[in-house]
């Protein structure tokens, strides 16, 4: 019909209406079809082989909880109760027992919906939230029946589980958009998508701490902080609320982000000199005096009231040329304010903030690690600067500041697997024919086709999605060693440290911040026959066993949030031809020091690559969520299934668990 915009109507660029969303099917939603012959066939056993002896080097050993502070309750609204279901896990969901009735209303729970949310809500029109300075793209309206799994009350007041879930779902969508669109706008587009679909929490502005966010948590964009309520401004450095006292209204500062790029901002971990907002010169205006309004006025009022202000410190991201990492450094008190002339000659407001006592170190830890890396100070308790003796691409420190132990028991360090039995494809392995590097979207690459048409990594280090198995390029592939599909075979990407724990032996942590999906290491050792290790408790302490029962969790993106057919969702269950058993007692790498946790921050992923005409399985570890420096790296060891306990809920491990998590199941192994 004339005058009615249809599917083939070309809009007038001078009269563009953003309320009209074109129904255009993107190319990334079309799944390519490849011949069955290019798909990887099943595996069978084949004769053993192992790495050369040059890969090994011998290693010889040489002869609290944050208190709660009472703060004035200055929050604007208090009538929304915090949900009673507050799982403490910040990494992934596990099955929980509920006393209430199970949902039987027939309402479909959306993918990634937090368990425990069974309320049925009326369908409501979803729009992008009206956030100040929010730079998000116009996104396509999704189906009105999409269920975010987050109730209205949970959007106002969150908890640790909801914060973890929102951040995990956001980053999963961001990774997928980056994988298929190859643009830098994936972050803002992912944020707009989640906001328009109600995937967020802690929307109620508040003074003081934010439920579910801990001191030391790190973020890789301001939008992440906005989604979980830590700092609602995506551009402005000062966030505030309007507090009502009778008929009077008064603004109070809730949080600030210190980017470290303004003159006078101190780098002291216990105090901060913060510059006010406004008055900056740009292409449309000259510099001017700052005014006592908006955020500046809110900081002045908070100085007078004495309320705590959340402080987020921004630091350069070493892995990105332009990116930043934001560290939540806890609550600060404003001690004084003044006005001084800036470099432009205009008046600038200055505020001194002092960190409140009794909080765990966050930014202070960050600055200490920077000094260790630069060689300005020596790591306390350092035993060896590199226990790998050069076997890894990066040194791995050995540290003990707990007792007099000088090192772990003797073992030979190796950076890869030693196979006594290998897995072989029933058909010959076919490598790619790429020159230089395998490119995203190149469907002529056989290695990419094995990964269902996608390059599994971003920037050669970040895993996009968990898969039944991932295929990497092998020796017969002509692509060079820096190919983005050669990740686990190129060694460590982060500076790691083996350290002595207080009650669990030796552990592993990183000096670098780890973004969700970051490759950490593979599990190196000797591949063993199941029958030779069963019952050997001493050797079992250094065994990785794929046949164990592991807690399930959701990590991948939700297809509905990236405009993909739900039937194309990538399965997260691993698909191995037979159980893989690796012993790291005699031969191993840093992975042998990773402790178990029932609430881990690391997960494992099978990776296959060709070697000498055979397809060999490797076990790679990736960050489950953003991990700050000096946080212990842990994964789920699983529980060995027994004939007496077929029901997973009745499984009991061989060793007592000391992870200390509130979700601790009591045993593992």
Curated annotation (Swiss-Prot):
Zn(2+) 4 binds at residues 598, 657, 659, 664. Its main location: nucleus. Residues 65-82, 93-107 have a biased composition (Polar residues). GO terms for molecular function: double-stranded methylated DNA binding; histone methyltransferase activity; zinc ion binding. Residues 56-127, 270-290 are annotated as: Disordered. Zn(2+) 1 binds at residues 432, 434, 438, 445. Gene3D superfamilies: SET domain, SRA-YDG. GO terms for cellular component: chromosome; chromosome, centromeric region; nucleus. SUPFAM superfamilies: PUA domain-like (SSF88697), SET domain (SSF82199). PANTHER family: HISTONE-LYSINE N-METHYLTRANSFERASE SETMAR, HISTONE-LYSINE N-METHYLTRANSFERASE, H3 LYSINE-9 SPECIFIC SUVH3. Belongs to the class V-like SAM-binding methyltransferase superfamily. Histone-lysine methyltransferase family. Suvar3-9 subfamily. Although the SET domain contains the active site of enzymatic activity, both pre-SET and post-SET domains are required for methyltransferase activity. In the pre-SET domain, Cys residues bind 3 zinc ions that are arranged in a triangular cluster; some of these Cys residues contribute to the binding of two zinc ions within the cluster. This is Histone-lysine N-methyltransferase, H3 lysine-9 specific SUVH3. It comes from Arabidopsis thaliana.
């Amino acid at each position: 019909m004339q005058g009615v915009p249809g599917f083939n109507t070309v809009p007038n660029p001078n009269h563009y209406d953003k309320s009209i969303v074109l129904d255009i099917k993107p190319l990334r939603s079309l799944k390519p079809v490849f011949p069955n012959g290019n798909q990887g066939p099943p595996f069978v056993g084949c004769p053993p082989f192992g790495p050369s002896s040059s890969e090994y080097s011998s290693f010889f050993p040489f002869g609290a909880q944050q208190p709660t502070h009472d703060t004035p309750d200055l929050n604007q609204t208090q009538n929304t109760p915090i949900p009673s279901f507050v799982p403490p896990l910040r990494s992934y969901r596990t099955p929980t027992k509920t006393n209430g009735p199970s949902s039987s209303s027939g309402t479909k729970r959306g993918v990634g919906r937090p368990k425990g949310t069974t309320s049925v809500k009326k369908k409501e029109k979803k729009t992008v939230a009206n956030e100040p300075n929010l730079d998000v793209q116009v996104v396509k309206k999704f189906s009105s029946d999409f269920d975010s799994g987050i109730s209205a009350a949970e959007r106002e007041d969150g908890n640790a589980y909801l914060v973890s879930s929102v951040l995990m779902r956001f980053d999963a969508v961001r990774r997928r958009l980056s994988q298929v669109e190859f643009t830098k706008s994936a972050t803002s587009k992912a944020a707009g998508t989640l906001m328009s679909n109600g995937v967020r929490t802690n929307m109620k502005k508040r003074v003081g701490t934010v439920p579910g966010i801990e001191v030391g948590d790190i973020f890789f964009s301001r939008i992440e902080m906005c989604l979980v309520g830590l700092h609602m401004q995506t551009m402005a450095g000062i966030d505030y609320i309007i507090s009502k006292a009778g008929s009077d209204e008064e603004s109070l500062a809730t949080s600030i982000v210190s980017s470290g790029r303004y003159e006078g901002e101190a780098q002291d971990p216990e105090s901060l000199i913060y510059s006010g907002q406004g008055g900056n010169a740009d292409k449309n205006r000259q510099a001017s005096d700052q005014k006592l309004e908006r955020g500046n006025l809110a900081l002045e009022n908070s100085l007078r009231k004495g309320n705590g202000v959340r402080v987020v410190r921004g630091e350069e991201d070493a892995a990105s040329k332009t990116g930043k990492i934001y560290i939540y450094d806890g609550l600060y008190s404003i001690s004084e304010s003044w006005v001084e002339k800036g470099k432009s000659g205009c008046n600038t407001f200055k505020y001194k903030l002092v960190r409140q006592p009794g909080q765990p170190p966050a930014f202070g830890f960050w600055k200490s690690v920077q000094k260790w890396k630069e060689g300005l100070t020596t790591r306390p308790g350092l035993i060896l600067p590199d226990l790998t003796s050069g076997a890894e691409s990066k040194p791995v420190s050995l540290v003990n500041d707990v007792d007099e132990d000088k090192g772990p028991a003797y073992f030979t360090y190796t950076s890869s697997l030693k196979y006594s039995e290998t897995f072989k494809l029933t058909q010959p392995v076919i490598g790619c024919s790429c020159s230089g590097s395998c490119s995203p979207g190149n469907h002529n690459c056989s290695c990419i086709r094995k990964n269902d048409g996608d390059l599994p990594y971003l920037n050669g280090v970040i895993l996009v999605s968990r898969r039944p198995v991932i295929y990497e390029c092998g020796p017969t592939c002509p692509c060079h060693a820096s190919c983005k599909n050669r990740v686990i075979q190129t060694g460590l990407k982060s500076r790691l440290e083996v350290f002595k724990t207080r009650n669990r032996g030796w552990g592993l942590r990183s000096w670098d911040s780890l973004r969700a999906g970051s490759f950490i290491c593979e599990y190196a050792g000797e591949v063993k026959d199941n029958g030779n290790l069963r019952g050997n408790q001493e050797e079992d302490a250094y065994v990785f066993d794929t046949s164990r029962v592991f807690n399930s969790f959701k990590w991948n993106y939700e297809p509905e949030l990236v405009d993909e057919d739900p039937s194309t969702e990538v399965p997260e269950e691993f698909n191995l031809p037979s159980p893989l058993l690796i012993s790291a007692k005699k031969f191993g790498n840093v992975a042998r020091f990773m402790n178990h946790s029932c609430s881990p921050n690391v997960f494992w992923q099978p990776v296959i690559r060709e070697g000498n005409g055979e397809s060999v399985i490797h076990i790679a570890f990736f960050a489950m969520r953003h991990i700050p420096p000096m946080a212990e790296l842990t994964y789920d060891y699983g529980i060995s299934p027994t004939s007496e306990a077929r029901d997973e809920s009745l499984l009991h491990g061989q060793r007592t668990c000391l992870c200390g998590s509130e979700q601790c199941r009591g045993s593992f192994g």
